[in-house]
């Protein structure tokens, strides 16, 4: 169970870093928002899923 928690937490941190870097780049590019809107929303949705998964898995680890 600890390994699953650690992998989920690593994915959460990695995705958070990608979103922190990627979303401003998308907004700064000329047609970035219209072309990458679906990718940004998918990333945000997956981020929320990982937030809840880390919270639930945390209750089993501690």
Curated annotation (Swiss-Prot):
Localization per Swiss-Prot or TrEMBL: Plastid, Chloroplast thylakoid membrane
Swiss-Prot/TrEMBL GO biological process terms: photosynthesis; photosystem II stabilization
Main location class: plastid
Membrane topology field: Multi-pass membrane protein
GO terms under cellular component: chloroplast thylakoid membrane; photosystem II reaction center
Keyword annotations: Chloroplast, Membrane, Photosynthesis, Photosystem II, Plastid, Reaction center, Thylakoid, Transmembrane, Transmembrane helix
Pfam families: Ycf9 (PF01737)
Residues annotated as transmembrane: 8-28, 41-61
Signal peptide as annotated in the record: none
Family: Belongs to the PsbZ family.
Function: May control the interaction of photosystem II (PSII) cores with the light-harvesting antenna, regulates electron flow through the 2 photosystem reaction centers. PSII is a light-driven water plastoquinone oxidoreductase, using light energy to abstract electrons from H(2)O, generating a proton gradient subsequently used for ATP formation.
Oligomer status and interactors: PSII is composed of 1 copy each of membrane proteins PsbA, PsbB, PsbC, PsbD, PsbE, PsbF, PsbH, PsbI, PsbJ, PsbK, PsbL, PsbM, PsbT, PsbY, PsbZ, Psb30/Ycf12, at least 3 peripheral proteins of the oxygen-evolving complex and a large number of cofactors. It forms dimeric complexes.
Protein name (Swiss-Prot/TrEMBL): Photosystem II reaction center protein Z
